[in-house]
Amino acid sequence: MSDDPSTNDALGTLRAAIKQAVTDVRGQTPLAQSFTNFVTINLVANAQLAAGGTAAMSYLPDDVIATAEIAGSNYINVGTLLPFFKNALPEIARKLHENGKTWVLDPVAAGIGETRTAILESFRDVPPTIVRGNASEIIALDAMWGLADADSTTPATRPAGVEAVDEVDAAVDAAKRLARHLAKRSPVGAGAVAVSGAVDLVTDGERTFRLPGGSAMMTKITGAGCSLGGVTATYLAVAEPLVAALAASLLYDRASEIAEVKSDGPGSFQVALLDALWNVTADQVAASDIIETN
């Protein structure tokens, strides 16, 4: 925290923007299209609806490109891959970039497998507007894109599937580099990276925030991170990248805390999470703990 009045004013302005984003999503029901993995597609769509948005799910490149023309934003998740995705996803990313469309990337299991690596490497020059992942995925993507000097890159300890083996603190520099890279090529002139963990981190490359809270039960259901990526895309349809990433992460922190109290285990937690996403107020989200760091 800072006692600097200018810092406090800036944080107050940010809170107001977060509140407005939550309000706008529920008032406008924006469409965020998802090309997401097979395991979690149902939860992603339901979470987008519960947050107040509209969902569209597709795997056909021509469908995705056509729907992007009417969608407010888009979401690509590389969690489960088929052979044709190796050509389809780079083409989709190129078209989104050429057409000035915003999108969110979840680089699930970055660093594992030649196909996934080739796809993620292809996004470097036509990148998303927001990247959301765990610490290991963020570190791996930063390394894939060659954004760090060789002597300053901190590689992930080992590939870990969809689970992080690195702490959020280890991904701070990688997240900042990625965010600055996204901003340089973004159709809206800005980008953001959200790193999920015990204490989430969100950065636009210039300002960095830590978000305490949330529930450890999020690690006991499949698709929590994937659905957060989808909801981040929902917010990106109405807000600039930093605000969208913060609003989605904070919404999930508050909703997961409520869901944990109301559930008896993973099954009821998932149901309670959807209910909480629906019921958490804009004021509750905006009033969450937000710690600005260097």
Curated annotation (Swiss-Prot):
Catalysed reactions, as listed in the record: 5-(2-hydroxyethyl)-4-methylthiazole + ATP = 4-methyl-5-(2-phosphooxyethyl)-thiazole + ADP + H(+)
Residues at which substrate binds: 57, 223
Binding locations of ATP: 132, 196
Protein's UniProt keywords contain Repressor: no
Biological or metabolic pathway of the protein: Cofactor biosynthesis; thiamine diphosphate biosynthesis; 4-methyl-5-(2-phosphoethyl)-thiazole from 5-(2-hydroxyethyl)-4-methylthiazole: step 1/1
Entry's EC annotation: 2.7.1.50
Keywords from the UniProt entry: ATP-binding, Kinase, Magnesium, Metal-binding, Nucleotide-binding, Thiamine biosynthesis, Transferase
Co-factor(s): Mg(2+)
A Gene Ontology molecular function term of the record: magnesium ion binding
GO biological process: thiamine biosynthetic process; thiamine diphosphate biosynthetic process
SUPFAM superfamilies on file: Ribokinase-like
Entry-linked Pfam families: HK
Family: Belongs to the Thz kinase family.
Protein role: Catalyzes the phosphorylation of the hydroxyl group of 4-methyl-5-beta-hydroxyethylthiazole (THZ).
Protein name: Hydroxyethylthiazole kinase
Organism of provenance: Bifidobacterium adolescentis (strain ATCC 15703 / DSM 20083 / NCTC 11814 / E194a)
